[in-house]
Amino acid sequence: TANNWMHMMWAGSNANEYYMSFRLQNNTQVGTITTNGSSTTYTTSSDYRLKENVDYTWDATTRLKQLKPARFNFIADDTNTLVDGFIAHEVSSVVPEAITGEKDAMEAAVLYVEGDELPSGKSVGDVKFPEQIAAQAIDQSKLVPLLVKTIQELEARITALEA
């Protein structure tokens, strides 16, 4: 959005080290992508100084039980490889912060790039572009705290039952 920006720079003494920083308008860093030539790291800022209203008492087990892991293949995958995952719009009611996009959204297919030649006498506004799926996506990392908290809750229940 207009309130956010990305900063990219080369960092470090090694020419193969790259750094990309994502920041809010007030310059608060919210994430980075770094690489050193042999690995890439994607991070989301998690510093306590950036947070408020911290609550450690929420019920993760109840929320986790609402998720429906599925096994499926992607239509565009000619190999029909089965993968484990989730359906984004189903997850959105349980962990909305993990989902981007809108259910059933469509967008114009990008067929024109500036500099491409258009049909004679036509301008970009005259050209009708076919629609394509504007796919929803899941940030799987947003599910990890739910998993950890559920394990802690279940461990506490086991300990209580064994006592």
Predicted feature residues:
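Trimeric beta-solenoid/beta-helix "fiber body" segments of extracellular/virion adhesins
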Residues: 1-48, 59
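Intramolecular chaperone/auto-protease modules of tailspike-like proteins
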Residues: 45-163
